[in-house]
Amino acid sequence: MSGRFTYRLLEQKDIPQAASLYNMSCESGEVVYSPLSEEAFAGAFLQPGMTAFAAMEGEKLCGFVHGTQKVIFLPGETHENTPGYLTVIFVDKACRGQKAGTRLAELLMDAFRHSGKKSAACSEQNPLHLTWRIPGTPGHDHNKAPGVDENCAGYPFLQKLGFETAHHEIAMYMDLKDYAWPDSMTLLRQKLSNEGVCTGRYDPRLGYEFDGMCDRIPSEYWRHVLQTETKAWLEGKPNSDPDLWPDGIRPSGPRPILAATYDDHIVGFTGPVDKQRSGRGWFTGICVDPNFGRRSIGEVLFHLLMQEFADEGAAFTTLFTGADNHARRIYERAGLRVVCTFAMMSKTL
């Protein structure tokens, strides 16, 4: 009990009220997220590894908080060395100013501590991916948020709770009808080819080595993507990892892989080439072997990906990158623009 509210775990019976509160905040522009049906809300917010608390006034739900914990780990990750993830806090307008949001956050932090977590975070590593809408577009969206929208009320609220901003991420957008392959990329691809670096679609039957690149970056994520995508090609099946499926929908089969190769090594990678139901070209990132840096390999791969998206009929693409990341210049030269800024935040428990 705290003032006028009681607090308890969010339950299935609360879904209609919780989804309504969530959707009202989405539709009023308080948050950038896309509205969800009650069924989609329940499917997203009530999964294994998730914790949610409700603030109640009698039978009325006045607010809720939601958090997650990883249940699938990359090499080197454990339950103990990964944070608990704060997903969202919502409080009904009529119930604000009564410390309900603060108490909900405290309950979630206590739950994280009890489960052995040493920190809490708001970042793109959250297993729950919430779609958000690109401002000023005809309903174009992105499949997950990389942190806290710095324009929403939640950002200063979390700062007051002791969350610190570890990193600023910018979300970038391009309508693909505006994309045009630049002649300079044709010349650059030829220059790289003359140096022994081939760029374009990669044939996994070649069996080129990529562990060296992943070790030097270093990135277990990219190792996993390359392992699963090349395996899918060799077996003639779709990628088996649901985390690598756009919209959670199993691909129809192996997908094109774009890579830069040198001798029998993969030294750069982007892809796989795919698109979401919304028409978004599904951008997962670009990696380049540090031993092959400063040769514009990443820029060539990015333009190849944009051309593949356009050829596949994608309507637009979005991505996020560090506000100070030099890759931002690559994306801006290709025609993308900044549409939102997010903060990756963390708090020691």
Label the model's feature ranges:
Residues 1-43, 48, 52-56, 61, ...:
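Short amphipathic alpha-helix that is part of the acyltransferase structural core
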Residues 91, 97-110, 288, 294-307, ...:
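Conserved acetyl-CoA-binding loop-helix of GNAT-fold acetyltransferases
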Residues 105-196, 343-347:
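Acyl-donor-binding surface of acyltransferase catalytic domains
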Residues 71-86, 96, 115-120, 274-283, ...:
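A conserved beta-turn-beta hairpin within the catalytic core of GNAT-like acetyltransferases
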Residues 302, 324-327:
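Short glycine/proline-centered loop/turn elements that form peptide/ligand docking sites
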Residues 63, 167-170, 268, 340:
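A structural microfeature
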Residues 50, 115-117, 314:
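Short, high-confidence coil segments that cap the C-terminus of an alpha-helix
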Residues 23-52, 57, 65-81, 222-287:
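A conserved beta-strand-loop-helix scaffold within acyl/acetyltransferase catalytic domains
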